């Protein structure tokens, strides 16, 4: 459960990072991406562990709020699932059609940007 939550927060952070303050960015980057402890972050910024914890929890709620309103991550996931289904279908029904493969690769490369 905790791993799923961490993965979700990291994904939301990737989508909505520009909307966060510098402090929110720093704390989440250190906590989730760089695996710092609350104490290490607190020491780094000369604040209490509780202040770091409160900021991280508040920022998690902000990220979830952005996702509830904008759905960027959910739509990204849906597009990726659909692209996977298309790729699987093409590979199983048209394995020698290089044009179809190239089109799918192009679509997937657009999504990766």
Curated annotation (Swiss-Prot):
Gene3D superfamilies: Winged helix-like DNA-binding domain superfamily/Winged helix DNA-binding domain. It comes from the Bacteria. Pfam families: UPF0122. SUPFAM superfamilies: Sigma3 and sigma4 domains of RNA polymerase sigma factors. Might take part in the signal recognition particle (SRP) pathway. This is inferred from the conservation of its genetic proximity to ftsY/ffh. May be a regulatory protein. HAMAP family: UPF0122. Belongs to the UPF0122 family. This is UPF0122 protein LAF_1235.
